[in-house]
Amino acid sequence: MPLVDPVTMSTTLIKSGPAQQQPAPKAAVPAIPLVNSPLALPASIAHSVLLAGLFYWRFDALVADPVTSLQTGLPVVAAIQAVYLMLSLPPAGSSLSSKKPRPGEKKSSDGREAKSFPTAVISLLLALILTPALHILLVLFGAPFLTHVPHTFLCCAHIALLAIYPVFYVRGSDPVPLQAVVGVSAPFDQTFGGFLGTVVGAWLGSVPIPLDWDREWQKWPVTIVVGAYLGYIVGSQLLGTVFYGRRWEVTPEMKEE
């Protein structure tokens, strides 16, 4: 009976055994393109122009009476956002494909038209539900706690319409893409660009408040709202078009040996 080398035998058994399963990589969160519609791009541009025009027109009223101006402007901004989302972006759960049908091929329907309106309504409600949480967050970052409560709450409602409403519309309640958006690891598109622009703009808008310029527009929360709107318009259009599909580059930390 021939001798069997135990080392060779163990090596053979390891090679012939089932391959060790590697952990599956996390699915990449895709960028959200505009829908394949002739109205998508014009509606996207028009919505930014309308927001900028509305804000410019109401700026003096915002400075004179922030609460009334923010309150009356809230339903108008919500309507502009809702129409833009339904015309330009796919609702959560619909196909992300922007492929045009070939000549003679019948365009397939993914139910986008049927999902757009209910998704827009539900996403709006979710965004407004998070307004108290944004209020608490702003207070933690230095907003007035016992005074200017309606000012802060209405400011947070506008931020929710700009930053959170579009994200819920295209991402839904799936925690994976939502974590990517909050963690700044999602690819740039109009919704993530608007989210990032609103947050950065509102943060930069807080810079002039403590300065001793004694200007009327420095009062709370005028500069915060100005920064949020400017950041949203620039972020959604610039990051959503010029840098579409790219990701925020984060330098990995050096691992300890």
UniProtKB/Swiss-Prot annotation:
Bilayer topology term: Multi-pass membrane protein
Keywords, sorted A to Z: Endoplasmic reticulum, GPI-anchor biosynthesis, Membrane, Transmembrane, Transmembrane helix
Pathway membership, UniProt: Glycolipid biosynthesis; glycosylphosphatidylinositol-anchor biosynthesis
InterPro entries associated with the record: GPI_biosynthesis_protein_Pig-F
Main subcellular localisation: endoplasmic reticulum
Compartments, record wording: Endoplasmic reticulum membrane
GO biological process: GPI anchor biosynthetic process
TM stretches of this protein: 37-57, 73-93, 121-141, 149-169, 191-211, 224-244
GO cellular component, one term: endoplasmic reticulum membrane
Family: Belongs to the PIGF family.
Role summary: Acts in the GPI biosynthetic pathway between GlcNAc-PI synthesis and GPI transfer to protein.
Protein name (database record): Glycosylphosphatidylinositol anchor biosynthesis protein 11
Protein species of origin: Gibberella zeae (strain ATCC MYA-4620 / CBS 123657 / FGSC 9075 / NRRL 31084 / PH-1) (Wheat head blight fungus)
Phylogenetic lineage: Eukaryota, Fungi, Dikarya, Ascomycota, Pezizomycotina
